[in-house]
Amino acid sequence: MAETDRATDKPAGAPKPAKTASPERVAAFRTGLSAEARAAALLIAKGYRILAKRFRTPHGEIDLIARKRGLVAFVEVKARASLDDAAYAVTPRQQQRIIDAAQAWLMAHPDHAELELRFDAILVAPRSLPRHLMAAFDASP
């Protein structure tokens, strides 16, 4: 049986929201984790291997980093009430933070720098299948 945190009855080492978070923030955190799990499952079903989840840098966070053959995809996961709302939630400012975080990840993993790189988004909404937008944005200025 997997080891659990006795205080929360969750798997040991699972990310936890801040202790002072409001109920709304806790709900958003859990929704995000669920959306990221659905997105990772979709990528795995499509033949990707997940290299990293929730990769954090001072520049920003990348929800998922996945590889399929000679391609590395940096994936932003957005969960909203509708897929259209999720699509509009990936702002230019956020795109730049993801690009900066991807550069930091590549510095730490130089063996992946020569592969094809792509910035994807996976949109998640209730009662809908997740939508994978390949090349949702690029690093070009």
UniProtKB/Swiss-Prot annotation:
InterPro entries in alphabetical order: Restrct_endonuc-II-like, tRNA_endonuc-like_dom_sf, UPF0102_YraN-like
Q: Which Pfam families match?
A: UPF0102 (PF02021)
Write out the biased-composition intervals (Low complexity).
10-19
UniProt region (Disordered), positions on chain: 1-24
- Cross-referenced SUPFAM superfamilies: Restriction endonuclease-like
Gene3D superfamilies in UniProt: 3.40.1350.10
Check the record and name the CDD domains matching this protein. Answer: PoNe_Nuclease
Q: Which GO terms describe its molecular function?
A: nucleic acid binding
Report TM segments.
none
Q: Which family does it belong to?
A: Belongs to the UPF0102 family.
- This one is known as UPF0102 protein BRADO0179
